[in-house]
């Protein structure tokens, strides 16, 4: 799974040729989530509220970077790292 960012132990990843709508995958320990890029809506999640809050804050700051990586992944192009939340 191509990792595009990591912060506070949270791993953000995207799959190549993944199904629409644009989204990214989150892993934190045994917790997982799928979050839409355009609306930041949860598609699937068992993240704790604290971790989810950090991820949504990060995604709101980097929505354009996420969409760019989504388009890259759809065309099998290398993904770009996204600045972590500090």
Tell where the protein language model's regions lie, with residue ranges.
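Basic nucleic-acid-binding interfaces
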Residues: 1-86
